[in-house]
Regions:
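RNA/tRNA-interacting regions in translation and RNA-turnover enzymes
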Residues: 1-167
Length: 167
């Protein structure tokens, strides 16, 4: 069964714009439906909350965030050319990070970014590549997040299982 996306309150997409400039509990469902790479239906019959980021390609991160926030605040339901969504989390799931990202991409048709690195030295090489702008060409990023993959291990480190690295 395909379940339609029926309501998107702004408080559930706070991460979408990178900062909260939208009044909480504002229904932005119709705006979200106009973003071309967000699936209109999902092939499961349960409530699911997906978090991610709205962005525009080839813009500085702060400018891209302002464009996304402006689009969501604007009262008109006009499509925004070039606005994209990348998913990074399903709320309240017990899937490990890799499985969750695969599920988002393969089963639910969301765009995701995912790298699977197992050694600290590889994470440092990845960080240097990102700082040198060798990654995410054309996609505005002001940081990367390193996460522990294993769900059970995450539960033993509730505040420390993920770490943001910013410019």
């Amino acid at each position: 069964m395909n379940k339609k996306i029926i309501r998107v309150p702004a408080d559930s997409v706070g991460d979408v714009c990178g900062y909260s400039m939208i009044e909480y509990h504002t229904d932005i469902t119709e705006k979200i439906k106009l973003i071309e790479n967000i699936p209109q239906t999902i092939p499961i019959n349960k409530t699911l909350q997906v978090r991610g980021e709205l962005y525009t390609r080839h813009q500085e991160p702060a400018y891209s965030q302002r464009i996304a926030a402006g689009y969501l605040r604007n009262k008109a339901n006009n499509p925004h050319q070039g606005l994209k969504f990348v998913a990074f989390q399903i709320i309240n799931t017990e899937m490990d990070q890799f499985t969750m990202l695969q599920f988002l991409r393969l089963s639910l048709s969301f765009d995701v970014t995912s790298w699977s690195l197992t050694e600290v030295v590889h994470i440092e090489k990845y960080r240097r590549s990102w700082l040198n702008k060798n990654l995410y060409c054309g996609t505005p990023t002001d940081g990367i997040v390193v996460k522990i993959n294993d769900y059970k291990l995450q539960q033993t480190r509730p505040n420390y299982w993920q770490m943001a690295i910013k410019y």
